[in-house]
């Protein structure tokens, strides 16, 4: 058996002299891809952190609104101060919700652009798609809680009106209050009031005040109605996205199984490689 290790080393030196930058040229496309997406990922991470912070502030504002509305029936403070605080929190929630919705829409566009430019399995496309779904879900939950808080405040106003009507000696049901609210005819309760009955007059004033509060509440709900419609569209689109993600995960599991099989075959081929036997015969210990 002839030792040809020296010939192999000579051929390797000749190849290095002919192609001194061959390895660099081979690896450069991968390096270019990494460097090309680095700045996109940094910008994406900043946007994700911003939306996460905004979502946390939105959730905190919604909780504050719920607590403020709960004080509407039990607090001894002047109702005017409670209403000012409630209106201020509601305006902040509406403004913050619009900002978050715009940022989520921009992230959705970035995800689609990254998928078209770098492929659906690229890092920037997968990260932006997954974070968009998670942040959108958090935003949807916060806005749902906000809607529940406003609906509960509406019920609180109706309960307070019903209490004041009982003070005036008027027994009405919730449906009757709803009808009166829609028609705005609260003066029907002043027909039999005596001039010297200050308590009844105060109760009527309280009812009219609650009616105005309900009108303001309806106005706030109308302001965010368009935002809720846009969120409904996002929910429908997100369902399709989740189905695609589930399919990609299943494909990844299949590819992983195939890769393991290929690795086992490669190990077997390496063990059966005739070059390994040649090197063993060329070893000085066999001389």
Curated annotation (Swiss-Prot):
Domain of life here?
A: Eukaryota
Q: Give the CC-aspect GO terms.
A: endomembrane system; Golgi apparatus; plasma membrane; presynaptic active zone membrane; SNARE complex
Kindly state a single biological-process term from the GO annotations of this entry.
Answer: synaptic vesicle fusion to presynaptic active zone membrane
Q: Cellular location of this protein?
A: Membrane; Golgi apparatus, trans-Golgi network membrane
Task: Kindly state which keywords UniProt assigns to this record, in alphabetical order.
Answer: Coiled coil, Familial hemophagocytic lymphohistiocytosis, Golgi apparatus, Membrane, Protein transport, Transport
Write out the coiled-coil annotation as residue ranges: 41-71
Assembly description: Interacts with the SNARE proteins SNAP-23 and VAMP.
Q: What does this protein do?
A: SNARE that acts to regulate protein transport between late endosomes and the trans-Golgi network.
Linked pathology = Hemophagocytic lymphohistiocytosis, familial, 4: A rare disorder characterized by immune dysregulation with hypercytokinemia, defective function of natural killer cell, and massive infiltration of several organs by activated lymphocytes and macrophages. The clinical features of the disease include fever, hepatosplenomegaly, cytopenia, and less frequently neurological abnormalities ranging from irritability and hypotonia to seizures, cranial nerve deficits and ataxia.
Task: Indicate the family of this protein.
Answer: Belongs to the syntaxin family.
Q: What is this protein called?
A: Syntaxin-11
What is the scientific name of the source organism?
Homo sapiens
Lineage runs: Eukaryota, Metazoa, Chordata, Craniata, Vertebrata
Its gene name is STX11
């Amino acid at each position: 058996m002839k030792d040809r290790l020296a010939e192999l080393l000579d051929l390797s030196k000749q190849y290095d002299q002919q192609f001194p930058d061959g390895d660099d040229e081979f690896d450069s496309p991968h390096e270019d891809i990494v460097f090309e997406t680095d700045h996109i990922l940094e910008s994406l991470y900043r946007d994700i952190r911003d939306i996460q912070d905004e979502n946390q502030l939105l959730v905190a504002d919604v909780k504050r609104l719920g607590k403020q509305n709960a004080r509407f029936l039990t607090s001894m403070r002047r109702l005017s101060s409670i209403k000012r605080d409630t209106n201020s929190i509601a305006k902040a929630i509406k403004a913050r919700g619009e900002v978050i919705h715009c940022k989520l829409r921009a992230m959705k566009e970035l995800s689609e652009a990254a998928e078209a430019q770098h492929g659906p399995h690229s890092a920037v496309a997968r990260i932006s798609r997954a974070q968009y779904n998670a942040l959108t879900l958090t935003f949807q939950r916060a806005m749902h809680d906000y809607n529940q808080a406003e609906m509960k405040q509406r019920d609180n106003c109706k309960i307070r009106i019903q209490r004041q009507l009982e003070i005036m000696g008027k027994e009405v049901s919730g449906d009757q209050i709803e009808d009166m609210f829609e028609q705005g005819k609260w003066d029907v309760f002043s027909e039999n009031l005596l001039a010297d009955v200050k308590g009844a007059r105060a109760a009527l004033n309280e009812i009219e005040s609650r009616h105005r509060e309900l009108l303001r509440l309806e106005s706030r709900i109308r302001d965010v109605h368009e935002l809720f419609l846009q969120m409904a569209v996002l929910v429908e689109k997100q369902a399709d996205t989740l189905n695609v993600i589930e399919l990609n995960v299943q494909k990844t599991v299949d590819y992983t199984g195939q890769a393991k099989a290929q690795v086992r075959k490669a190990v077997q081929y390496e063990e059966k490689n005739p070059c390994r036997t040649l090197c063993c015969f060329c070893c000085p210990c066999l001389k």
